[in-house]
């Protein structure tokens, strides 16, 4: 029997086949996929809403969830006090907004009203409760405010309170969180959810009849419930009285009730064919349970919540901000009163904060323009370059690169930290692949780390010792009997660890790190670089010759490194180092799901050293000198050190460059660490040894903020290094090298925007969302978080799965933000026609710019700046 016939028989909803699938797919736009915390990937929560403008989404979220996504008044006042907002930009923004409005009030009068309102002061409660003001509002009941009313469809459970005064939506959330934890748990418990292999809905349906948390009547509602999730969802919607035209909005409301758990469900549904309908199953479980809980209260008279316009605040705003007395108000004609009310309604809090945000962003853009203009130099005035080093575009690379260039004859480049290699990596002794590329891409090749058989056996034996200890501990912890004895057995050891880790973290950390290196010292390894035709896996192993040449050519052209090679070229991945930190993966590559970049850097450098690759590139005009050697290193962002991971046999000139880098690296680390550490809240005084302090932060397991990560990111600059060289960009800019003269077709620029540009935007808006709405898009305080089911963090044991960054990643103190919530400014160094072509050809990017999700500026070959 088809779903269509079941729906027609059991419900009043006349749907087409697969309509439920389409509605769920459309509704899912309001949530973003949430990666597990162990493979934390930057994402922004509004990625599915970019067809609407930022302003529209802000108004919509304020209406349906009461979530503000503009900076608060406190943030704005703080930024203005620091000189981050110029008043002139605010005034010009206000003038443009007033020009766009239609009103019949003297311009001077509305300007005076707006100027005072833009101080962002709250209306006094004494004024709002004043009898005269409330009487005025009552007497104006004849004013037509229908055009100003809002109505939104809310989940039925959110409209009902039980006899205990509990909102039924809170009770529903409690149940759903419980079932999500049971189904999604991959590592937390030894007893998994029965029938889990049959899917979320079927497993839930099997157990719900035994759930003691439900009443007998609630279980009775679900007793003979449909076996199919789609049918169950349609039936529940029908019995709740949701009309077909309102279904998508209703589903969106439920997805936004727990956006973290729903986001994790959505991510899981994208990972395998077996779980591709998991989001439908989630909604079937949730709305079926909603029906069971709310059944005694049905039917409701009205499921749409009408938000009538409050007249009192509108009148009070004109009295307080417009300097109109109650007597003057009474003497006005009704038409004028109505006009004033409508204007006050339009110039609401969102508009006021929007104007401040835009002024803040314009001030930042102007300050960046001046900084770049003051440092521009002739591109032909170049010093002798001893080594060239390519770093990830990550904002944390910028200070390190700046100090490196100051202290030695080096040239640095910015490139996406996976170096254009779409690979899944398999480290020595591992049977699992880990995608080592941005999460917006899928791996096309599998690269295995290899060594000889004897070395491999020895290494695997050493690994098994550590694995068996961890496995034994986990088994004892999860076993009913042994878990009671475990605290007594392990207490002394963990007590000693706690004391030493807290009071001598650097020394203990170094000891443990050295012990681990000794025990798990890798032998010399190679890679499976050559293509294997017959492979059992879905992803082919290695590269063909053409693929090797293509990936190297593509990366070198992307950064404009096709001539004038230095004797030593170093590909620098990056990684982080912290202890007792659930968000450790978030401090790795923000794009690559917690993957460090060292593996890719080593693979790329190895490819560049292959004679067959160099010969093919030389035939195309990219001639790499014979004495130029490619090496690989890893930039440790928490301690600002460079760790060599691949140094082949060096030529004489390359050895000189290598020795020079080694000699200045301690100074580079000291300068970079000092600059970075002084930004932390606990370091306002002079630091004697910055590198030692950085290591202490990395090893101290009580440290809640080992580094700032990518906080304060604000711009993505695409251009030659000369554009920003010697500029102190304060670790706020993503830097990607680009030479427009080598990109006649514009394809390289298009690829940078589609790949690294998208990733930078995701990172930027994740930090933005976690700052402006931490209660909804952040993850609260690290010190009170609970790591749940190996998936993510919760506050306590019954909260949403928290989707964003913790308080410590964006806040300097309880009252002071560290991250400046600005939308990403993309600056492209290229002629105007290149930008026009990009916008004409890339509809998605043009939409982001037009709808206010990113900002765009360009610098032409003559150094002229243009805001788009």
UniProtKB/Swiss-Prot annotation:
Entry-linked InterPro entries: DabA
Membrane topology: Peripheral membrane protein
Compartments in which it is found: Cell membrane
Parts forming coiled coils: none
Cofactor: Zn(2+)
Pfam families: DabA (PF10070)
Annotated residues for binding of Zn(2+): 392, 394, 574, 589
GO-annotated cellular components: plasma membrane
Stretches that traverse the bilayer: none
GO molecular function ontology, one term from the record: zinc ion binding
Domain of life: Bacteria
Keywords: Cell membrane, Membrane, Metal-binding, Transport, Zinc
Assembly and binders: Forms a complex with DabB.
Record's function text: Part of an energy-coupled inorganic carbon pump.
Family to which this protein belongs: Belongs to the inorganic carbon transporter (TC 9.A.2) DabA family.
Protein name: Probable inorganic carbon transporter subunit DabA
Species of the source: Bacillus cereus (strain G9842)
């Amino acid at each position: 029997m088809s779903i269509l016939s079941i729906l027609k028989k059991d419900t009043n909803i006349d749907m087409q086949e697969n309509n439920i699938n389409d509605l769920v797919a459309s509704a899912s736009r309001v949530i973003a996929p949430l990666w597990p915390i162990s493979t934390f990937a930057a994402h922004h929560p509004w990625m599915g809403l970019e067809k609407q403008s930022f302003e529209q989404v802000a108004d919509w979220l304020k209406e349906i969830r009461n979530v503000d996504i503009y900076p608060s008044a406190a943030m704005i006042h703080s930024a203005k006090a620091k000189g981050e907002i110029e008043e002139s930009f605010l005034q010009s923004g206000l003038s443009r907004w007033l020009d766009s409005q239609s009103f019949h009030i003297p311009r001077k009068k509305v300007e005076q009203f707006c100027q005072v309102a833009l101080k962002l002061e709250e209306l006094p409660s004494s004024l709002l409760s004043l009898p005269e003001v409330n009487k005025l509002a009552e007497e104006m009941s004849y004013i037509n405010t229908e055009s100003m009313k809002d109505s939104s469809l809310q989940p039925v459970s959110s409209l009902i309170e039980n006899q205990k005064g509990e909102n039924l939506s809170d009770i529903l959330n409690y149940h759903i969180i419980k079932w999500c934890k049971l189904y999604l748990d991959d590592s937390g418990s030894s007893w998994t959810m029965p029938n889990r292999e049959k899917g979320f809905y079927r497993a839930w349906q099997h157990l719900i009849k035994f759930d003691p948390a439900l009443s007998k009547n609630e279980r009775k509602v679900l007793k003979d419930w449909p076996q199919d999730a789609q049918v169950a969802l349609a039936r529940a919607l029908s019995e709740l009285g949701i009309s077909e035209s309102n279904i998508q909005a209703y589903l969106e409301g439920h997805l936004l009730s727990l956006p973290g758990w729903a986001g994790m469900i959505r991510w899981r549904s994208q990972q395998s064919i077996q779980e591709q309908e998991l989001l439908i199953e989630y909604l079937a479980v949730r709305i079926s349970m909603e029906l069971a809980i709310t059944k005694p209260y049905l039917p409701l008279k009205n499921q749409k919540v009408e938000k009538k316009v409050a007249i009192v605040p509108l009148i009070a705003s004109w009295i307080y901000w417009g300097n109109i007395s109650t007597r003057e108000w009474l003497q006005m004609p009704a038409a004028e009163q109505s006009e004033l009310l409508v204007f006050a309604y339009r110039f609401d809090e969102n508009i006021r904060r929007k104007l401040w945000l835009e002024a803040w962003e314009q001030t930042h853009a102007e300050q960046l323009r001046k900084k770049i203009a003051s440092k521009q130099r002739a591109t032909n005035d170049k010093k002798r370059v001893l080594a060239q080093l390519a770093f990830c575009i990550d904002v944390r690379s910028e200070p390190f690169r700046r100090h490196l260039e100051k202290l030695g004859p080096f040239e640095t480049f910015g490139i996406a930290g996976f170096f254009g290699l779409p690979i899944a990596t398999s480290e020595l002794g591992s049977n699992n692949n880990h995608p080592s590329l941005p999460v917006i891409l899928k791996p096309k090749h599998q690269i295995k780390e290899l060594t000889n058989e004897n070395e491999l056996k020895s290494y695997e034996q050493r690994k098994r010792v550590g694995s068996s200890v961890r496995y034994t501990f986990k088994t004892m912890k999860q076993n009913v009997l042994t878990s009671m004895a475990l605290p007594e057995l392990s207490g002394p050891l963990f007590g000693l660890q706690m004391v030493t880790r807290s009071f001598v973290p650097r020394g203990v950390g170094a000891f443990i790190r050295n012990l681990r290196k000794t025990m798990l010292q890798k032998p010399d390894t190679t890679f499976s670089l050559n293509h294997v035709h017959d492979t059992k896996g879905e992803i082919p192993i290695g590269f063909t010759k053409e693929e090797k040449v293509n990936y190297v050519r593509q990366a070198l052209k992307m950064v404009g490194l096709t001539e004038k090679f230095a004797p030593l070229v170093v590909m620098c991945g990056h990684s982080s180092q912290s202890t007792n930190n659930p968000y450790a993966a978030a401090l790795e590559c923000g794009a690559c799901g917690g993957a460090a970049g060292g593996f890719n850097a080593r693979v790329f450098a190895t490819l560049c050293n292959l004679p067959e690759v160099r010969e093919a590139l030389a035939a195309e005009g990219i001639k790499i000198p014979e004495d130029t050697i490619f090496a690989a290193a890893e930039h440790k962002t928490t301690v600002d050190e460079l760790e060599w991971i691949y140094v082949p046999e060096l030529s004489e000139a390359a050895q000189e460059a290598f020795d020079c880098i080694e000699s200045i690296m301690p100074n580079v680390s000291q300068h970079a660490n000092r600059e970075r550490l002084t930004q932390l809240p606990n370091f306002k005084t002079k630091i004697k040894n910055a590198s030692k302090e950085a290591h202490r932060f990395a090893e101290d397991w009580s440290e809640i903020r080992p580094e700032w990560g990518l906080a304060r990111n604000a711009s993505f600059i695409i251009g030659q290094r000369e554009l920003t060289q010697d500029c102190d960009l304060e670790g706020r800019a993503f830097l990607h090298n680009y030479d427009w003269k080598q990109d006649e077709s514009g394809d390289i620029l298009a690829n940078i925007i589609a790949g690294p540009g998208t990733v930078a935007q995701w990172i930027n808006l994740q930090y933005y969302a976690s700052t402006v709405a931490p209660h909804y898009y952040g993850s609260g305080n690290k010190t009170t978080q609970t790591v749940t089911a190996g998936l993510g963090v919760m506050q306590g044991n019954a909260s949403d799965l928290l989707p964003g960054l913790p308080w410590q990643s964006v806040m300097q103190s309880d009252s002071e933000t560290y991250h400046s919530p600005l939308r990403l400014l993309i600056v492209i160094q290229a002629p105007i026609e290149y930008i026009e072509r990009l916008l004409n050809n890339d509809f998605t990017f043009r939409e982001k710019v037009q709808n206010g999700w990113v900002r765009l500026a360009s610098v032409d070959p003559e150094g002229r700046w243009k805001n788009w």
